[in-house]
């Protein structure tokens, strides 16, 4: 009896470490950043003629508020078209740190100022962002000669000065600059095409997303520093329960190879990502939900039937036990070749699959998963899928033929 049963049973462990492609949505999960969208600025692009010494008080610019990568993309295109920028043209006094303009910052965040200068006819003079009216009171900032990056800036009025004083009077100075402030506001909602850009203050950053139906949340969280380096972030996911946030997943961290996407099985509800970065760094939050809410059986007796050429998608939640099982069945109406395809809905998924029935089937690797196949006799075949690890996200089981 035992020998006959083993002939009719297939038990395999399927590892879906390669499954990231099933949840990615093209360009919006590509690693984009502020630096990758910056245009080239030149001091001469809008210069028409020499002017008398200008008043920097007349050269004022409101920094554009940036909440998403789309916001910055739009602003960058305007800069490229010489819009949303200011131009200073004038002459220095002797030994003067020339003030070339005023920047008004309306919200707290990281300030990004692309600029270009021409001093005494030579390109490349550096600017610095200071508290208004005092060139000696410089904000903490990174400056590469083309862009100023200042973190944890409070809303207020600031000024741009030449970093080096002009020794001679009547030195011609030209400066072109734009200004953006990436918001440090917490508790915004991200998802779909809404890629949040959030300036870190050094404390924990919280950004929210929603899951409408039980499924797989494909989340990408990464950060960018003042030098333009992009890297991974270790973060946790919390679910709102009543008025309390409860942690449901910790130690999550994506890799550059898969554009920092990590998949997590979650029930319907409101969630937030908790991430940390150094002050001034920009955190990016991307979320793509893949629904996986088809019904499943909780026991062999309650197995849900999958019709021929149909499939079911389901997910093991991140906080479910590794002993959790889902049951399905197919009905083979006549003897012949039968194919059952099982694919993952997330990276690093691991499940075990047991198939029992009138014939023992084989298995082989297919794109993004495994195929269970063979000449099946007429009858009912049961498919038991068991959660294999805490990292399990989701799967699809299809009665292909």
Features from the language model and the residues they span:
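Solvent-exposed serine/threonine-rich low-complexity stretches and specific carbohydrate-binding patches
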Residues: 134-144, 246-256, 360-369
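Exposed aromatic-hydrophobic patches
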Residues: 146-152, 258-264, 369-375
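Gram-positive cell-envelope targeting signals
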Residues: 1-33
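A glycine-anchored, Pro-Gly-centered beta-turn/N-cap motif
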Residues: 154-156, 267-269, 377-381
């Amino acid at each position: 009896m035992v020998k006959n049963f083993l002939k009719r049973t297939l038990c395999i462990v399927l590892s879906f470490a390669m499954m990231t492609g099933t949840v990615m949505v093209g360009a919006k999960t590509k690693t984009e950043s502020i630096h990758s969208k910056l245009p080239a600025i030149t001091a001469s692009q809008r210069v028409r003629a020499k002017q008398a010494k200008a008043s920097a008080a007349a050269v004022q610019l409101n920094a554009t508020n940036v909440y998403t990568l789309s916001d910055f993309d739009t602003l960058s295109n305007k800069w490229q078209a010489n819009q949303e920028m200011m131009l200073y043209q004038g002459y220095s006094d002797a030994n003067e740190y020339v003030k070339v303009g005023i920047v008004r910052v309306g919200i707290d965040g990281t300030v990004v100022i692309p600029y270009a200068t021409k001093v005494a006819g030579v390109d490349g003079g550096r600017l610095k962002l200071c508290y208004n009216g005092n060139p000696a009171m410089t904000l903490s900032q990174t400056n590469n000669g083309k862009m100023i990056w200042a973190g944890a800036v409070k809303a207020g009025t600031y000024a741009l000065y030449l970093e080096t004083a002009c020794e001679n009077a009547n030195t011609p100075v030209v400066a072109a600059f734009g200004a953006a402030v990436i918001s440090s506001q917490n508790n915004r909602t991200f998802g779909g095409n809404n890629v949040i850009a959030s300036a870190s203050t050094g404390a924990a950053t919280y950004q929210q997303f929603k899951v409408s139906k039980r499924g797989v949340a494909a989340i990408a969280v990464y950060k960018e520093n003042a030098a333009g380096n992009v890297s991974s972030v270790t973060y946790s996911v919390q679910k709102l329960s009543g008025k309390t946030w409860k942690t449901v997943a910790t130690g999550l961290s994506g890799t550059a190879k898969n554009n920092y996407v990590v998949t997590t099985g979650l029930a319907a509800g409101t969630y937030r990502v908790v991430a940390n970065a150094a002050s001034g760094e920009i955190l990016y939050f991307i979320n793509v939900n893949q629904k996986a809410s088809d019904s499943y059986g909780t026991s062999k007796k309650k197995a849900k039937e999958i019709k021929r050429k149909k499939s079911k998608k389901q997910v093991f939640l991140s906080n479910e036990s590794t002993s959790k099982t889902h049951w399905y069945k197919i009905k083979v109406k006549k003897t012949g070749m039968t194919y059952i395809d099982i694919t993952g809905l997330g990276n690093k998924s691991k499940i075990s699959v047991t198939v029992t029935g009138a014939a023992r089937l084989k298995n082989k690797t297919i794109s993004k998963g495994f195929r269970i196949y063979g000449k099946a006799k007429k009858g009912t075949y049961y498919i038991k899928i068991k959660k294999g690890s805490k990292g399990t996200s989701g799967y699809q089981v299809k009665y292909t033929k």
